[in-house]
Amino acid sequence: AIRLKEINTETAAFTLSYTIESSAGDINTFYNVNEYYRLRWTDSKVYLLDFERRMAENIGLADITVSSGALRLGIGDASDIDYASYGTDQQQYTWVTGDQQLWLYDNTNRIMTKVYTEEDDNHNCGRQDEAGIKVVHADPETGDLYFIVYGYMHSGNYEGREGVMVYHFSHEDVLLEDLVFIPFNKGFEQMRSGLEELAYMNDDGTLYLLLEDTVYAIDVNMGKMDVAYKDLNSSNCTASGDGIFVMCDGGDENAGERLKIVDLNSGKERTVEGGDWRIVPLGYAGRDLIYGLIDPQMLTEDSSGVIRTPISEVHILDENYNEVKTYQKSGDYVMRLTISDGNISMKLAKAIKNGNYTDYQDAGEDYIIRNIENDDQKIYVDKQKDSIRGQQNWLHLNTSDSFVPISQSARYLDPGYDISRKYEDTDQVEMQYYVYTKGRMDAAFATIQEAVDYGTTYAGTIMTSHKQVIWQKAGRAYIWDRILTVLTRPAVHRA
């Protein structure tokens, strides 16, 4: 399948998706390949501005093996793999997602179940890139999974529509069923940005989803959907993996007067006051909450007319809300903060007065290292190489045995009636700036300056939440003569 990603008078970007079969010895393997091209053309030349090929192995039931305690996940990008172990002292499970598939491994009985896959044997209409899977609850007693699939619905009763489908997988019955479908017509970017912040289900069967500026509470057993919190700024919200949701309260769209912290498991609420400062949540590192304080006098326009949110202080609270770290650097402001495991990276800048405006000059980066306790430290993914397939991903399962587990696929139960629920659509769209790299949405920002900084670093294209492309950065070009077909292999020279 060929998908046009962007086009204007001089440049175009598209992706080419296809499946290939590889034979090595007695092994036949299928791979899903996605190629990204970005081109610029003139009257006589075609320039290849960017190219990337990504490939992921299409793991089938016959491909499942455990070698020296590691489950083979095949060739692919390890960053696309998510996993977790759960269960009781008597029964352990591990779920893993990757390449738009969900698998469940019964560690105790050595049974591997393909719970969900986007592929449909009855269709051959090509894969859709704009889709995601997220496990929202794993029951340690029964082994059951609850998860959402969001984006383009590739098959089923809602095939061809975009939205969020809530699924339940019964481990005992090996049965997959649809619970609720929420249509969403504002685009994948808006959907993904909210669900990445909050998609969580508690033990009582209440699922919380952030869509646009509203948190919805869904009773998955009754199929009832209500509004839990509304009129939020999703850029100023965050959530922990165990159901602690943080939002700004008071203030304006840039920052709040206090943080409102809600435990979605118990319903208990508490606040963190900003005092004379404005306050914003920045994210979670494990169970540690990170937030920033902003001097209200610094919430002013820069010379481009955009209000910046320079953070003067960064604070870290542990799960008991004790302050364990404070960061500030005289003369510098934190303009962007990213969290990866226990590593906190901060982009710094100095304020420069420019007439009636305040601009910011790059002042490098700084870091905070937190020792985050990993609940799944005995379960991890690494790469190993063999003589046939080369580098592959392996999921280590806290055992040293080698064996071929029992493999099975979940049966699907059609509910037989309409399970769609309408969310509170709004004509107002919160302005966000989405940075696309290699044809995929890579990051979202509340200000254009942050988006441009990121796009400059990673050669991206910026699109607003109103579907307007406003900025592009070209990469290094490779040249074809115009008479050559773009997708052949011509002789090239570097521009």
Residue map of PLM features:
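Surface-exposed loop/turn elements that mediate protein-protein interactions on large endomembrane-trafficking
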Residues: 46-74, 101-127, 158-190, 210-230, ...
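Beta-strand C-termini and the immediately following turn/loop, strongest in propeller blades
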Residues: 94-99, 147-153, 197-214, 241-253, ...
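C-terminal, active-site-flanking charged/polar segments
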Residues: 280-292, 297, 309-324, 334-347, ...
